[in-house]
């Protein structure tokens, strides 16, 4: 069994894999010689879904399972993992725009002086964070604004002289 793409990265859109099943020299036909089903682990149990009718399936980063079950002269069941990887927040398609006329010395000093409110202080410096390579329906011309707390968190850098965005949810990595 081959599945493509092999290593998709989160892009906001549904990523239904192309599946080819071959036994010897015979390429099997879906719904004739085998059935294809999908599942994802939810709360410790496999939740099945049909990506043709559930447009929210195979969208988010995570591990999914494809099951091939033989029929009409073919028997057995094959399980294949299909992983949609988190997108790295340091990817060039993720753009960070800062507010104009920021007094960085004051902002960084305020954030360092009050660590409990550092995130709010630093957030006020960011105009927007957006992903310019999205394929989901609610992206406008491939661009979607990211949401703090859902797609990234913000903190004072380890040096105390800058900010760090840390990917969360469908995003991973750090951006300084």
Language model regions located:
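Solvent-exposed beta-strand/loop surfaces, strongest in extracytoplasmic domains of secreted
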Residues: 1-176
């Amino acid at each position: 069994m081959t599945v493509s793409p092999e290593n998709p990265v989160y892009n906001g859109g549904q990523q239904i894999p192309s599946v080819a099943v071959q036994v010897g020299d015979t390429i099997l036909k879906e719904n004739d010689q085998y059935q294809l089903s999908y599942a994802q682990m939810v709360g410790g149990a496999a939740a099945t879904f049909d990506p043709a009718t559930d447009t929210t399936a195979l969208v988010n980063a995570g591990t999914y399972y494809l099951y091939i079950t033989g029929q009409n002269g073919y028997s057995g069941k094959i399980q294949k993992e299909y992983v949609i990887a988190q997108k790295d927040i340091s990817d060039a398609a993720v753009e960070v725009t800062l507010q104009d006329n920021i007094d960085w010395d004051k902002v960084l000093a305020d954030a360092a002086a009050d660590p409990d409110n550092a995130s709010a202080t630093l957030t006020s410096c960011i105009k927007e964070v957006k992903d310019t390579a999205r394929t989901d329906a609610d992206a406008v011309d491939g661009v979607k604004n990211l949401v703090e707390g859902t797609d990234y968190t913000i903190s004072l850098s380890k040096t105390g002289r800058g900010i760090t965005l840390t990917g969360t949810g469908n995003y991973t990595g750090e951006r300084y």
